Amino acid sequence: MNLLVHINAICLVLFLSSNTYAQNQIVADLSQENVKISTDFQGAKILLFGAYDGQEGDDIIVIVTGPKGLVTVQKKEKVLGVWVNTRKVNYINAPKYLSISSNKKIEDILNKKTQKISEIGLNNLKIRMQPGIKVENEKEWRQALTRNMLKSNLWSINENSVSLNKDALFRSFLILPSNVITGQFEVKILHYRNSKLISQQINSINVSKSGISAEIYDIAQNYSTLYGVFAVFLAVLVGWGSNLIFRKV
């Protein structure tokens, strides 16, 4: 608690004395800007804190977006009594991580039209299917994408999780799960007043691998053929060794 008090006090002093105060009316910082993923990585909890030139009733929304890329959704059907993947759809620009936090319900901050224009909300993301793919019930595929990402903790909506203090200070905890991918993450802090954007700031978090996991990842990316051959060889070796042990037993 004392640490948070000191952080808030320092943040407020920096805010009131900086040029950013006059320009953006909001300043923010992170307790950790670099996250290292090792073999025993269990996730990360990062404190976002800052100050803003606020009034009673102002709102803060924090959006953390990870690298965008290919995300595959597969459809399973029962064939001869066995569940198998029968169809798949690729989304080519889906965020691999997305967290939206706010000081209260988003619907109480922004109307549906503004949410859609600003891409705030999981259903408002402008995500495209891979060109050439034609499917029926596109809405169901999109719902499946959202459901899968929520289930894997890679997407989340965290309303009422941003704490505001005296219309001047704010803080929130950002949670990165253990299965988070590497790359540059954008942290966007939005300050609203009567549903209108007053100010904003963008910070970043860098997530990278370290130790032996980084070396394995580099080999897999840069020497994919060699890595594949080694993986097959290792699997054969383990199988042969297990068979030999059980044969002796």
Regions found by a protein language model. Give the residues of each.
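Juxtamembrane interface at the cytosolic side of transmembrane helices
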Residues: 225, 235-249
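Short, aromatic-rich amphipathic segments at membrane interfaces
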Residues: 175, 198-228
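Extended, hydrophilic extramembrane loops/domains of integral membrane proteins
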Residues: 179-209
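Short edge beta-strand/loop segments characteristic of extracellular beta-sandwich folds
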Residues: 47-53, 173-175
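Bacterial N-terminal signal peptides
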Residues: 8-17
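Membrane-embedded segments
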Residues: 51, 64-89
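N-terminal edge beta-strand
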Residues: 23-41
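Membrane-proximal low-complexity regions enriched in glycine and acidic/polar residues
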Residues: 78, 84-177
